Amino acid sequence: PYYRAVSDEVEMYEAAYEARMPVMLKGPTGCGKSRFVEYMAWKLQKPLITVACNEDMTASDLVGRYLLDINGTRWQDGPLTVAARIGAICYLDEVVEARQDTTVVIHPLTDHRRVLPLEKKGELVQAHPDFQIVISYNPGYQSLMKDLKQSTKQRFGGLDFSYPESDVETEIVAHEGDVETEIADKLVRIAERSRNLKGHGLDEGMSTRLLVYAAQLVGKGVDPMAACQMALVTPLTDDPDMRDTLSAAVNTYF
């Protein structure tokens, strides 16, 4: 997978992996957190198990449960247990979406013990030496209800992500969207304008992911104005005035 390093995050992650330190990635949506984890798993030649967290997720969804089949009941390992057994990197995406009582099950895996108790089964899984846990979340829209407990936060080393510098972002958009640098540069300038509106009518500026979408549409022969409308303006907001403002920014460059 393609990943363009922005600062020293690759070296820092490698050092954390050597120490088998659990890692927390913080940053806005679409800034490359998940791609970074995929890239690091590929670089370290380790399997990656990704779990998209949601508020309906229970501890059993992570750890495992008994299932009924023709022969009676059998135990089915959850993704966290599988990762701990085989020595994979387990990536919990948007971990604040999960309920706090669910995230507590990772505690024994993220300190010196490195074990996972399967209470229903009466088994204690000793984590494989290669096992590591990575979580990510967006610190921008946490409420008091949806934040990590201090007891969870203080088990992780943290890496901060944000949108790259404009020249780096241009390079990423040109590569991923397969368009000329000139188009990518204009898209990045539009995004920078939208990011200045964060907190003034927008919850979040245009992400690098949206810029790549717009670039891909342009690459497929779509008119740049229409591509920006579809990929950048429409998904971002429902407010008509805000849309006009964003469309004006698009018109400035295309």
Where are the regions that the model predicts?
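AAA+ P-loop NTPase catalytic core and its hallmark functional loops
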Residues: P1-D185, R189, T252
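Alpha-helical lid/collar subdomain of P-loop NTPases
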Residues: P1-Y3, V10, E165-S166, T170-E171, ...
